[in-house]
């Protein structure tokens, strides 16, 4: 699959190839929407119920795309469907290697996974990847999921870019904090009704031995990490109803609580 947005300075959005191993495993290589973020960020932009993403998605993520290797599986326990997934990516988001030979990848890899449980059976084809209940599920359908990721060296506020800031070790070489994200979410649909609820937490680790100056005389203070990474907690709840005529009504409530108070140089400004 190949998809681009030429209104963007970095137009490449999706470029990947997948191999299906029977019915229970799909292996994908390339750049695509990762499943290690919150539920709304898994959905493609054109499949959202509202014009933009919630402030939770905007604060903790960028486009949600990663370059790497993705493993997606599907298992059944009677009527219950289990969907475990694992991803190993560059940790620099889309267009990971920049626009030139000197715009190189920074930091380490990103490791993530997700487990979705569908206790009432599967949604109709594709209906769990859109905001509204376009398929008008005849029976109630519920998805409960959890995801986590570990970005081993982030140099972008949400871990989807590189070189936006540089921190150092004692010797003056570049050294970046690790960014850890956890998400829990659910999606419910039935006869035109849709409910999505999600929680996200982002935290930084490996801060010891990091300095803000290459001279190695200004150690990074714990609260100063808010100047570089979007950390904290957030939750989002969205309820909608889709009429048979195609008209829909949606309401959303979102809140983000940063881990530390923002400063004039924090990513929020």
Could you say what each language-model-derived stretch is?
Residues 121-141:
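Short mixed-charge
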């Amino acid at each position: 699959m190949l998809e681009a947005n030429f209104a963007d300075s970095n137009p490449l959005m999706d470029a990947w190839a997948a191999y299906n191993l029977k019915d229970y495993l799909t292996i994908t290589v390339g750049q695509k929407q990762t499943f290690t973020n919150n539920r709304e960020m898994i959905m493609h932009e054109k499949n959202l119920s509202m014009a933009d993403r919630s402030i939770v998605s905007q604060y903790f993520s960028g486009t949600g795309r990663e370059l790497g290797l993705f493993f997606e599986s599907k298992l059944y326990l009677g009527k219950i469907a289990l969907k475990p997934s694992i991803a190993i990516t560059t940790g620099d988001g889309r267009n990971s290697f920049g626009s030139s030979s000197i715009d190189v990848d920074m930091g380490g890899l990103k490791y993530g996974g997700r487990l979705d449980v569908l206790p009432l059976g599967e949604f109709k084809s594709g209906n769990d990847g859109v905001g509204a209940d376009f398929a008008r599920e005849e029976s109630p359908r519920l998805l409960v999921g959890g995801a986590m990721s570990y970005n081993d060296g982030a140099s972008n506020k949400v871990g989807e870019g590189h070189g936006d800031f540089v921190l150092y070790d004692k010797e003056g070489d570049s050294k970046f904090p690790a960014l850890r994200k956890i998400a829990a979410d659910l999606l419910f649909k039935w006869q035109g009704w849709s409910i999505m609820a999600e929680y996200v937490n982002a935290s930084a680790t490996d801060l010891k031995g990091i300095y803000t100056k290459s001279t190695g005389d200004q150690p990074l203070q714990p609260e100063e990490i808010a100047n570089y990474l979007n950390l904290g907690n957030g939750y989002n709840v969205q309820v909608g109803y889709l009429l048979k005529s195609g008209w829909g009504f949606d309401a959303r409530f979102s809140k983000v609580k940063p881990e530390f108070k923002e400063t004039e140089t924090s990513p929020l400004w």
